[in-house]
């Protein structure tokens, strides 16, 4: 699958809201309401069935987003969708700003130190609140703060490489 055709997981249906077909939606976008900007959605049910949806809209409601999907008007339909994952094609996301990256684009890149020591590949990233952390898996797992330019010196997609200023023994 080409990179721009890859599916990016943005959220999940976590329940019904009220009795008129509104949906409680968990979003992993930043900000979380940005999920509504990226459409069409590819919905994947827990049993693997997929459908495409365009026209989802919603609002913030504290812990979750509350969404409305075209054609869904009752709670029973929503409850049957519990656990459904919301994806978009990578091409639906706008290009990131300079020195900003989508985590999914970093996954799988090789990681080397500024001295050329191979540490492994980017497995995934997570946020600590203070900064993001890149998890590198190689001969062992390392967690490196994704802080530009202090620890992460460069990201080169053409070379499939992230260069870090990091002690390979740490």
Swiss-Prot record:
GO BP annotations, alphabetical order: ribosomal small subunit biogenesis; rRNA processing
Predominant location category: cytoplasm
The keyword rRNA processing is annotated on this UniProt entry: yes
Domain of life: Bacteria
GO MF terms, alphabetically ordered: ribosome binding
Cell compartment(s), UniProt: Cytoplasm
Entry keyword set: Chaperone, Cytoplasm, Ribosome biogenesis, rRNA processing
PRC barrel domain boundaries: 97-170
SUPFAM superfamilies assigned: PRC-barrel domain (SSF50346), Translation proteins (SSF50447)
One cellular-component annotation, GO: ribosome
Family annotation (InterPro entries): PRC_barrel-like_sf (IPR011033), PRC_RimM (IPR056792), RimM (IPR011961), RimM_N (IPR002676), RimM_N_sf (IPR036976), Transl_B-barrel_sf (IPR009000)
Annotated domain remarks: The PRC barrel domain binds ribosomal protein uS19.
Family: Belongs to the RimM family.
NCBIfam families: 16S_RimM (TIGR02273)
Function (record text): An accessory protein needed during the final step in the assembly of 30S ribosomal subunit, possibly for assembly of the head region. Essential for efficient processing of 16S rRNA. May be needed both before and after RbfA during the maturation of 16S rRNA. It has affinity for free ribosomal 30S subunits but not for 70S ribosomes.
Subunit structure: Binds ribosomal protein uS19.
Protein name: Ribosome maturation factor RimM
């Amino acid at each position: 699958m080409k990179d721009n055709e890859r599916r990016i997981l943005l959220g999940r249906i976590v329940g019904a809201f009220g009795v008129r077909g509104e949906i409680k939606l968990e979003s992993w976008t930043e900000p979380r309401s940005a999920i509504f900007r990226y459409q069409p959605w590819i919905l994947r049910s827990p049993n693997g069935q997929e459908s495409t949806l365009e026209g989802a809209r919603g609002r913030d409601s504290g812990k979750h987003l509350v969404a409305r999907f075209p054609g869904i008007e009752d709670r029973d339909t929503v409850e049957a969708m519990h656990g459904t994952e919301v994806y978009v094609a990578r091409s639906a996301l706008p290009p990131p700003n300079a020195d900003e990256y989508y985590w999914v684009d970093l996954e799988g890149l090789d990681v080397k130190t500024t001295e050329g020591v191979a540490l492994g590949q980017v497995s995934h990233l997570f946020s600590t609140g203070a900064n993001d952390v890149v998890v590198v898996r190689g001969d062992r797992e390392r967690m490196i703060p994704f802080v530009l330019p202090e620890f992460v010196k460069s990201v080169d997609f053409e070379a499939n490489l992230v260069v870090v200023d990091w002690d390979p023994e740490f």
